Amino acid sequence: QKQGANTLVLEYLHGLGGLSTLGMIGVYWDGFRGGYTAHIDKSVLAMAPKDHPRQPKGEGRFPADWKMEWHRKELLQAGGKLWFGVMGCGALIEGSQVKGVVVATPFGRGVILSKILIDSTGSADIAIAAGAAFDYTGKKTIAVQGAGTGKWAPGDYYNNNDWLFVDDTDILDVSRAFVQAKTKLQGQYDLVKIPQTRERRRIIGDYIISVYDVINHRRYPDTISYHKSSFDTHGMIIDPLFILNPPEKRHKIYDADVPLRCLLPKGLEGILTTGLGASAHRDAMPVIRMQPCLQNQGYAVGYLSALCVKENKSPRKIDIKKVQRHLVKIGNLPERVLTDKEFKGFSNSEMKKAIASVTDNYKGLEILLTDPERCIQLASKQIAGATMPEEKVILASILCILGQGKHAPVLAEAIRQYKDWDEGWHYT
């Protein structure tokens, strides 16, 4: 709205902020806290005097009611409109163009027309209703990140937990989670109003961020948001890299860029999808789902969308460098994004260097797995000349996970040598 575009925000709960407020996750974990997020943080805490008894102790902590009210007031003061108690339940499309959103309201169903629609449901609900392809638990794997349904006592703003698995697109499963929570939290004042989920439906966008993109610090010419976190997986992992070599401990922080094309549902125009609904592999999502980063992403998408309306262009046709210059100016993005180039893939010499080092506890595997075919060729050649049993086991494990089953006997023999289970990995 501040950029001159007519803006309507729809929210089915009674306050803004989602999991950061009514979801009782009012404390930051990791994440990049510069840019627009720094403005939010400072403004929310300035809603009361510094000596107010409810002022949080420590950084990155925000009372839920303060943050909800700041969002509401900021939106209305800028001239935007806000409808509470309204849920998006469909999309109006014409060919590949999204023209509006179907809504369920206390007064019945209706349609709101849009030039640009921002799907910040967190599970790509509107984009998927419009026909966007998506990925989620159940199609290829049963892996899902742990979730919770926390208590809510007067004055609370942080009750983070991880004790259940829930499909928040299934109303029966969500109902089951709340029934279960009422039993688990019997005697508490109240419960959160939305399931505290960490994994949801993700669009198939113009590009899909991979684990390798994050670990290899891939850069893009169309970066729209900057992220910092660890592979805090809260559950099973499925990427071949992590099956062979589990993620490093929680304290290992990665920085990752998210390009605009990961917010654009493939084959659709006039819509962007933010947050946990973005186009990324599920194992990469923990690094790009931190609240501070997504607040900056929300600002960036809002700014870009307003520009699209003013210039009568689609998000794919907008001058991304113009958007980036503004985001760099306010601190959302590092200045390097203005000159970042498209990644062309690793060279043959880089791949050969990686295969030479991979027998040292899988060092360089994140490079090799970016190109499975070349990896198979190099590993097959390497294992043929390997003499050390430990090297053969590592190379055989790589080949087997890429479908080269003839090397399975090497792994079977190695497994037989173990008398006990290892300590495993506590992934919650």
Regions from the language model: what does each represent?
Residues 1-5, 129:
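Alpha-helix C-terminal capping segments
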Residues 5-6, 10-90, 94, 135, ...:
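Conserved N-terminal/central alpha/beta ligand/cofactor-binding core
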Residues 13, 60-64, 68, 287, ...:
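Solvent-exposed, acidic/flexible segments
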Residues 40-44, 68, 85, 89, ...:
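Flavin (FAD/FMN)-binding glycine-rich loop and adjacent Rossmann-like elements that form
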Residues 77, 106, 341-376, 390-391:
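Amphipathic heptad-repeat coiled-coil/leucine-zipper-like oligomerization helices
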Residues 95-101:
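Short, hydrophobic/aromatic-rich segments at coil-to-beta transitions
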Residues 351-356, 378-382, 410-415:
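Buried hydrophobic core positions in alpha-solenoid tandem helical repeats
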Residues 360-373, 381-385, 390-404, 423-428:
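Structural detector for internal amphipathic alpha-helices that build alpha-solenoid repeat scaffolds
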